[in-house]
């Protein structure tokens, strides 16, 4: 069956200590690619995975992705990256406070035995000093099989600037392509604005968090709508600012209209990957409706389902019809401003 979507992102071996002493996930499939897929698969599972892994990545996980109906032929096994650590660690000290460091102390705080498989873990330095630096396990444009380059709806998860820009160039050739991009926080700084503007010309929808977009315009403006307008001047016709529990701001550049969407109210279990799940849902909604506000509502539903569970595929555990019911309810939670 042909795939409607391609998502490029990172895969990790995830160690997660959720908020409120939730059930720990130890050496489980993680990474922003999977969380975005979980949000999209609520609506449509015909997805090509674009990623890069080394030989330490469990083959049985790849088989599980295939069993779920995902196309794994875009995952490139790179034997030259076997020295790279694929582990990730996330611990919540509070519902909204997460840490990627000092795993030993976090396991002790949670009164959990420290897993031997996490020994020697060091978090990746996310500081960006040079935009030409690449992440050793980010997906690479020239590894994408040719048969996937004509897929019409593509989402790029956060990873390094160079790899993202090369993938935008790879996919933007077709007039029917819709590319959404979630920026990596490391390069959302005023010093990198000139380079970012070049990449934006090939992007349909730009999906930053409020924190990221404020960082980009630090010292220039506090007005989120002005920020969205300035970004749209360089190409993206849709700007969605993800605002966590406050919902989303949606700027429709083509119509010059602004919308505020409330977050669907749910009980928070684990916010890990909620922004990625939103982006996956957004892409599904945009493919179905070609409408930025409707697309953001699809994303909001996916985000709400993710918050209620732990693990990238938890949005798929909802009762049949739940996503559609929430989508209907959200129609009343949109306000034009």
Model-predicted regions and their roles:
Residues 13-17, 21, 46-153, 324-337:
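Conserved N-terminal subdomain of the carbohydrate kinase-like
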Residues 2-3, 153, 221-337:
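Conserved phosphate-binding/catalytic region of the ribokinase-like
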Residues 21-38:
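Short catalytic helix/loop segments, enriched in acidic residues and glycine
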Residues 54-55, 158-163, 184-189:
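Short beta->alpha connector loops
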Residues 166-178, 183-260:
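Conserved phosphate/ATP/ADP-binding segment of small-molecule kinases
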Residues 40, 209, 275:
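Short, conserved phosphate/pyrophosphate- and ester-handling motifs at nucleotide-, phospho-/glycolipid
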Residues 2-12, 180:
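Short, hydrophobic/glycine-enriched beta-strand segments
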């Amino acid at each position: 069956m042909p795939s409607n979507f391609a998502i490029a992102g990172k895969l990790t071996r995830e160690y997660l200590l959720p908020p409120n002493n939730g059930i720990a996930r130890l050496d489980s499939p993680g990474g922003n690619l999977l969380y975005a897929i979980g949000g999209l698969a609520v609506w449509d599972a015909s997805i090509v995975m674009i990623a890069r892994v080394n030989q330490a990545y469990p083959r049985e996980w790849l088989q599980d992705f295939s069993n779920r109906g995902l196309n794994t032929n875009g995952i490139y096994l790179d034997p030259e990256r076997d020295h790279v650590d694929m582990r990730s660690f996330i611990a919540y000290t509070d519902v909204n406070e997460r840490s990627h460091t000092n795993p030993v102390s976090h396991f002790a705080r949670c009164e959990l035995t420290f897993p031997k498989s996490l020994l020697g873990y060091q978090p990746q330095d996310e500081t960006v000093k040079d935009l030409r630096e690449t992440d050793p396990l980010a997906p690479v444009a020239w590894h994408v099989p040719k048969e996937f380059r004509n897929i019409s709806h593509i989402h790029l998860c956060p990873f390094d600037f160079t790899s993202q820009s090369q993938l935008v160039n790879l996919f933007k050739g077709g007039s029917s392509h819709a590319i959404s991009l979630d920026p990596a926080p490391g390069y959302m700084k005023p010093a990198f604005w000139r380079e970012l503007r070049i990449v934006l010309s090939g992007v349909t929808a730009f999906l930053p968090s409020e924190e990221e977009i404020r960082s980009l315009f630090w010292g220039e403006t506090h007005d989120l709508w002005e920020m969205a307008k300035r970004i749209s001047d360089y190409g993206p016709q849709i700007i969605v600012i993800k605002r966590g529990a406050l919902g989303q701001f949606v700027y429709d550049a083509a119509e010059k209209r602004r919308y505020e969407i409330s977050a669907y109210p749910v009980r928070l279990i684990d916010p890990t990957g909620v922004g990625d799940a939103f982006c996956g849902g957004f892409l599904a909604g945009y493919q179905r409706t070609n409408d930025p506000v409707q697309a953001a509502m699809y994303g909001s539903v996916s985000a709400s389902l993710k918050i209620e569970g732990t693990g990238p595929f938890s949005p798929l555990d909802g009762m049949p019809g739940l996503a559609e019911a929430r989508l209907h309810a959200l129609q009343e939670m949109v306000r034009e401003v």
